[in-house]
């Protein structure tokens, strides 16, 4: 339980359903933002046989797991279902669900489903190779992970499903539909389909028409924090919530995470450190990157958009390093009763800033239009075991994650004019005290770490509360409920060192991309259609 406040004015509670890439959670909060209990279940998104790149979302099993989590959360909280005043859902973005004309879900895919690589290439050729730019100028998205190539794939290979489709939503909206029977999308999540206008925050049907796709499958758009419907008797029997409980529009996981962190005003900046790292900047008005390096998403705050860059597999890289090379440290940490990452950070803290020049090659900065990475490697190693060892490599990985984040924030500042004056650092990465200090040193601005680091569910609960009048507004509530654990001030002595390290890394990374281009090495990840 995260302790923000020990007093609750009433016995009212809110539930957030958080459908992530690797798991689903049902989280109960009191009205002061304290997490009371959570039920969690891992889920898998398996490939379809003989469909390369596919990542199917199992609608039947995943609803059963969601119901299991809801019941588990209520049990752990020792609360009756009547104590839940409202529920809202959030999810990974990009994942879509199709329904037939009676409203029954018939097909879904998860966020990084890459089956439509050929269709991405096909769509890029439209309008003398200008269609992707048109999509980006309208929606802030490129085609790689958008919905249109996936719909075109269905038209090509599963015309039975394509013909049956009556409505399209996101995965968060599917959860809300399973609870309430109502169908709608919110701008923050639906914006990642590449079919929503950043300015109007509504669908742009002509984009589908230009792609030769049906434009009659677009569901109503409702803003985050508005009432959608109520838990049906059928859903109540399945999940354990009380029939009639209000169901409120949720949204995309990153945007609701920013709400839970109080990142609700223009100019505010967050770095969300999970499996992927997102660098998010609130923009004063909808603008796009003329170089198409950065995605632009609708925020859950009406009228606001966010520039978002993504570092690939940052958290996954740290886990790989821990599991592949640090068996001794894992055993020692277990004996000491501490987290292995904490032990590795203690070791890395004794390594000088700059990690003796070791350069990790993993994620590139974000280049949304042509998005791929070099082959994973370490460059500039030494044979001196005093200088090149596990502690050095671990520090180098933490420094590199901060360097990539700083490069992404610089790209955003270049086209938007918005330069971060401070950074909110959240997610699992923010648990690292050394990592937080390194991020401050590399970016050159103060880094604030919140008490609640996994803030997506809290933001979702805030939306639920606003929808039933328990909170006044999204932005004011997000600001009021966030609590700060600590702040890190940049060490100016490290500024020149990290600037040089960043310049050197950028040059070396460019050379490493050349090896991928020549077919000599294998990219860490490559977007569909490249």
From Swiss-Prot:
GO molecular function, one term: autoinducer-2 kinase activity
Gene Ontology CC terms, in alphabetical order: cytoplasm
Catalytic activity: (S)-4,5-dihydroxypentane-2,3-dione + ATP = (2S)-2-hydroxy-3,4-dioxopentyl phosphate + ADP + H(+)
Keywords: Cytoplasm, Kinase, Transferase
Predominant localisation class: cytoplasm
Class of the enzyme per the UniProt entry, highest EC level: transferase
GO BP terms in the entry: carbohydrate metabolic process; quorum sensing
Domain of life: Bacteria
InterPro entries, sorted: AI-2_kinase, ATPase_NBD, Carb_kinase_FGGY, FGGY_C, FGGY_Carb_Kinase, FGGY_N
Pfam families referenced in this protein's UniProt entry, alphabetically: FGGY_C (PF02782), FGGY_N (PF00370)
EC number from the UniProt entry: 2.7.1.189
Subcellular location: Cytoplasm
Family assignment from sequence similarity: Belongs to the FGGY kinase family.
HAMAP family listed in its UniProt record: LsrK
Function recorded in the entry: Catalyzes the phosphorylation of autoinducer-2 (AI-2) to phospho-AI-2, which subsequently inactivates the transcriptional regulator LsrR and leads to the transcription of the lsr operon. Phosphorylates the ring-open form of (S)-4,5-dihydroxypentane-2,3-dione (DPD), which is the precursor to all AI-2 signaling molecules, at the C5 position.
Protein name (database record): Autoinducer-2 kinase
Species this protein is from: Yersinia pestis (strain Pestoides F)
Lineage: Bacteria, Pseudomonadati, Pseudomonadota, Gammaproteobacteria, Enterobacterales
